[in-house]
């Protein structure tokens, strides 16, 4: 019952302004307008590859929820939208369904309603260290089967676990367990953050292990803020105060893309505070191969306007591409751009090129 309440708390708090903290620094990235693009808007091609699978836009539905009746209804709506628009979809952490088989349906609705698009299974790093290699392989297999996954994501959420009232901040040995997941999965492995970003140093340690890094940068939904609000409601004053102290902790998404690009050089997925198709195109210009959005789509789903929100994002991507003269998604990387003082200073101090 406690984990059910936590899952629903996360849904309501993530969709509210309480969860929104800081800036991802996309305002620090200015794409240079091309007044002579030499193409028609109708010629712009937004098709992209998501870990080998062709999709209709360089954009997907990020990890959100699962495990409760409300979560199941939301996942069904998100999956229908992913299928309609031909874009990938992550599910939220599947641990709850692995220990409570009666809630598996809240994840299985995704493969039922999105049979043809890439789906991403999702497990949390702290739970990996509890399992031996055989049990971990079983969990991976079940998580994959539950959603007919094209890829498996392992989420790194050290900051969230450190402030969560029920947190499990156990991260010793996680990298070795991620390697076990890679062997067991038999499909692309994504290692992702959940709102505090990936540094160059961590990205370098994931080279040769992860098939993709999802930076999950700072400047959007903050699980530190969410857990702080939950702690306050539960009267857990120590956790509330720690959350208040650390709610601005993390690497802004724009900087994290550059960090990951420098340390890793492979397939990078941008997430964290992306609030428009223009933000997404800026992320691609910085070096990401793909981007996802979560909070705006969760809020839209709860308000019954999910289709309109995704239509808008795709149209914004296409418009931004047209205005920088990018006919294909690959062309975005060569778009001229200017950086604001905060991002420029970060790159200089960290010795990064982006």
Swiss-Prot record:
Gene expressing this chain: fni
Residues that hold Mg(2+) according to the record: 161
Gene Ontology terms, MF aspect: FMN binding; isopentenyl-diphosphate delta-isomerase activity; magnesium ion binding; NADPH binding; oxidoreductase activity
Binding partners and assembly: Homooctamer. Dimer of tetramers.
Identification of the protein by name: Isopentenyl-diphosphate delta-isomerase
Binding sites annotated in the UniProt record for FMN: 63-65, 93, 122, 192, 221, 273-275, 294-295
Binding site for substrate: 6-7, 93-95, 160
Pfam families named in the record: FMN_dh
